[in-house]
Amino acid sequence: MAQDETISPAEDAAVLEALFDHSPTGLLILDPELRILRINLTRPALHNVDLAQIVGRHITDVYDLSAPGEVQEMLDGVLESGAPAQGHLVRVRPKGAPGPEYLFSVSVSRLESPRGRVWGLLAEMLDVTEREKVSARVHVYGAVRQYVGQTLNVVTTCEELVRELVPGVADIAVVEVVDAVVRGENPPPSPLQREVPLRRAAVCRSGGEEQIQAHPVGDVRALPFTTPYAQTLADLEPRLVALGPDTPWLAADPRRAEAIRAAGAHSLITVPLTLRGTVLGLLSLYRTRHTDGFETGDVTLAVAAAAHTALCIDNARRFTREHTIALTIQRHALPLRPATPTTVETAHMHVPSETGEAAGSTPSPCPAPGPR
């Protein structure tokens, strides 16, 4: 094109058409009343609709937004001030659709005529759904590594795990530990035998609302073999399971089935707590009616969190066993009570300091028999 040539209106329109239709980011044009004039979104689930049915409608009539009030305030602010908004995270789902939510980074600019008349808004929508999921999983795993295993107590370690997984990964998290492990005994080898009992060590739910519990914390029982819980401990493989009202294996555990249905749980992950071919316990994660189902990335995170926790549980188990042995030896090493009555008797016992500081043996005076 020669330097003195100009683009015709038709060519100018064609260039804009190509830019709009082939933009790598989603584009949305709204009028001053926030009604949709044109749309080009990269997610098929968001634009696979009849354009004739959405053009001219308010954006909140077409899409469910995670925070519609905040979005409305942002758009109104750009219309009034002309100052663009950059990088607002907005969760979007087609109106009334049961599918997953998508997360967009939204930047908005005001459209004006050469004379300054406001035409509307241009919204650029970058799909960051997968990026944010990965970032969230990395954050949760970092928290598990930092906060799980701070004590040498099996049950406390399990409680630390479920607190870090809810609500960032799951709506409900349950940890069950082989009962012998809680007492400091050696964990059984895999595959776990059907009759081996597990103790429900920790449960955490999002929202804190009261829900039906399959079994209370502290309950000890074996797992029905036909369930994915028992199968996970048999082959030490994680499972991602869809849950529904007619899921056949729920009949093998009626109380657990009742709790699952009451919570509206529709997605389940089961992961073994295992170390060096032995079985320490089981991690179960649930998502309920308020959230999307689990993905393979969530399974990967759960496996990594379970591996770290299994090591911490085994350390706590070893400490429990050694502490029990030390107390037993200490009791047997106490001096026998002297047969001769005395005015004051002393009993010697070494009491370890809870603060980790050195503590000596302190004689404890006891009253002597008789009138003295």
Predicted regions located by residue number:
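GAF sensory/regulatory domain recognition
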Residues: P44, A52, R163, E176-R221
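Short hydrophobic secondary-structure edge segments in sensory/regulatory modules of signaling proteins
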Residues: L27, A173-V175, L268
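Short hydrophobic beta-strand micro-motif common in sensory/regulatory domains
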Residues: R256-A259, G264-T274
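Sensory beta-strand/linker motifs that couple input domains to effectors
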Residues: L121-E124, V271, G277-R287
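Regulatory sensory and allosteric helical modules in signal-transduction proteins
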Residues: A52-D64, E73-L89, A201-R261
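Sensory coupling linkers of modular signal transduction proteins
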Residues: A2-A10, L111-V148
